[in-house]
Amino acid sequence: MSGVGGGYPSDLTDEQWALVVPLFPPARVGPKGGRREKHPRWRIVDAIFYVVRTGCAWRQPPKDFAPWPTVYWYFTWWHDDGTVERIHDALRGKVREADGRDPEPSAGLIDSQSVRTADTVPAATRGFDAGKKVKGRKRFIVTDTLGLLLAVHVVAASIQDRDGAKRPLLWTRLDHPGVKKVWADQGFAGRLAEWTAKILGRDLETVRKDPDQRGFQVQHKRWAVERTFSWPTAHRRLARDYETSPAHSETMIRWAVIGVMVRRLTRGRAATRPGPRPLVRHVP
């Protein structure tokens, strides 16, 4: 919650903040635990969500947030130590349980999306997707059947689907051993399915279009992953890729999906913003 003007639409409500605050590492309180943190965590998190949602540059958030170098330092720290991924994965389990599912999925879907990049993106990390006529980067995602993210991998757009899919499929195999089958479109057919079966011991099934199909139709079993791509691209920072590092692009996507999940988990509850939140959470 912003301290000025009642907050911004991208700010977390207190109910949403209560879901994520236990998942952050304990705040440093000094003197032996490191330098005491000057800015409340919720101001840092709200500033990150503001950047993700509005697409503003790191150096240009409103002045009522923490200074931008501080916000960016936390963004990088939480990326490097795995905090963002842990928060994302914990919330995904809660969303699945709220939907009456087991926290761990048994099936998945994979797809890719090519997006344009800003001029500041290094040439070595972008390329040209000849099929989609896009110069930029390609996002590979694996989701569960609800469309919740299991793995994300960002590469140059010139990488073929059959090559770029191997790493997210491997991550899914390692992090979610219960996933036995993954559905994909025809762009992933061929030797990738053979590799998945031989190396990962999993079934990659291609969902083919009906030969009588005319125009756009939602494909059975694949609509969820296609919808998932709309979640990050609704955030202006992700409408194109601005990040110097592909790994930071992956983290930006996770932040966007975290925002989607906390809103889903608090849907129907009255949103309240009663005042300052504590800097330090109590750790048993």
Q: Which residues does each predicted region cover?
A:
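Short alpha-helical elements
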Residues: 1-284
